[in-house]
Amino acid sequence: MPRPPKCRWVRSEPNVTHFKPVGVPMSMLDEVILTVEELEAIRLKDLEGLEQEECAEMMKVSRPTFFRIINSARQKVADALVNGKAIRVEGGNYRVYDEDQRGHRGMRHRHGQWGRED
């Protein structure tokens, strides 16, 4: 039996959760689902320009785990861009931390859908 996945830490839940090509109705598009932790990995590495080791520390995962998360995220984004698919950000196994409080206070645990607390 596989070990249950550990929660990844993310700074915040995304404000925007859907992206799609202009001029094509959503009903005609295939969709790629990007998890919240995959979006966080892209934010840390590609937007903030942090080293993978720093990103892994911030998300509280090992470097190999971060590498797998960022590779999965990049593959999904590339698929959506090249093949004209919509991107929906949802789900995953993560914790949201307050910028000022990285301890257990100020953290909310999320798994799967928005608003479902464990």
Curated annotation (Swiss-Prot):
Pfam families tied to this protein: DUF134
UniProt superkingdom: Bacteria
Cleaved signal peptide residues: none
Alphabetized InterPro entries for the sequence: RNA_pol_sigma_r3/r4-like, UPF0251, WH-like_DNA-bd_sf
Family: Belongs to the UPF0251 family.
Protein known as: UPF0251 protein Teth39_0655
Species whose genome carries this gene: Thermoanaerobacter pseudethanolicus (strain ATCC 33223 / 39E)
